[in-house]
């Protein structure tokens, strides 16, 4: 009986040891999403903004073809993954119920290597995201028609 209890405790403790990395991995995908796509209060939304943000966010080696920055409150973006600000959309995606202010940066020129030059398109759009554990982890670019 004591040996069985000891084995149970060992398995239980090992299970606890495995839980935090899983949660940390989920949060890291969300943090990566924010790094690539979130800028709460942009300073200008022109070509220079795109070139600066793409460089600062590490998206220019090689030059990323297209990237969208979402502006505003991150809680509203998170809410797309629930019923508060999101609806199901196609396969395993969610679409926002309300539009977001966004800046889409499109690569100009043919070279994928720096210096990267971008053209900015600013506007308001509903956004489509993939969610894991109620957090956005991927922005579906196909919804945007700059």
UniProtKB/Swiss-Prot annotation:
Keyword Aminoacyl-tRNA synthetase belongs to the record: no
Disulphide-bridged cysteine pairs: 50-105, 63-116, 81-131
Membrane-crossing segments per the record: none
Keyword Transcription regulation recorded: no
Xref: InterPro entries: RNaseA, RNaseA-like_dom_sf, RNaseA_AS, RNaseA_domain
Family: Belongs to the pancreatic ribonuclease family.
GO terms under biological process: actin filament polymerization; angiogenesis; antibacterial humoral response; antimicrobial humoral immune response mediated by antimicrobial peptide; defense response to Gram-positive bacterium; hematopoietic stem cell proliferation; innate immune response; negative regulation of apoptotic process
Enzymatic class: hydrolase
The gene coding this protein: ANG
Motif (Nucleolar localization signal): 55-59
Protein name as it appears in the record: Angiogenin
Regulation of this protein's activity per its record: Has weak tRNA ribonuclease activity by itself due to partial autoinhibition by its C-terminus, which folds into a short alpha-helix that partially occludes the substrate-binding site. In absence of stress, the ribonuclease activity is inhibited by RNH1 in the cytoplasm. In response to stress, dissociates from RNH1 in the cytoplasm and associates with cytoplasmic ribosomes with vacant A-sites: ribosomes directly activate the tRNA ribonuclease activity of ANG by refolding the C-terminal alpha-helix. In response to stress, the angiogenic activity of ANG is inhibited by RNH1 in the nucleus.
Residues recorded with modification Pyrrolidone carboxylic acid: 25
Subcellular location: Secreted; Nucleus; Nucleus, Nucleolus; Cytoplasm, Stress granule
Top-rank taxon, per record: Eukaryota
Oligomer and partners: Homodimer. Interacts with RNH1; inhibiting ANG ribonuclease activity. Interacts with PCNA.
Organism of this sequence: Trachypithecus francoisi
GO cellular component: angiogenin-PRI complex; basement membrane; cytoplasm; cytoplasmic stress granule; endocytic vesicle; extracellular space; nucleolus; nucleus
A GO molecular function held by the record: RNA nuclease activity
CDD domains from the UniProt entry: RNase_A_canonical
Keyword annotations: Angiogenesis, Cytoplasm, Developmental protein, Differentiation, Disulfide bond, DNA-binding, Endonuclease, Hydrolase, Nuclease, Nucleus, Protein synthesis inhibitor, Pyrrolidone carboxylic acid, Secreted, Signal, Stress response
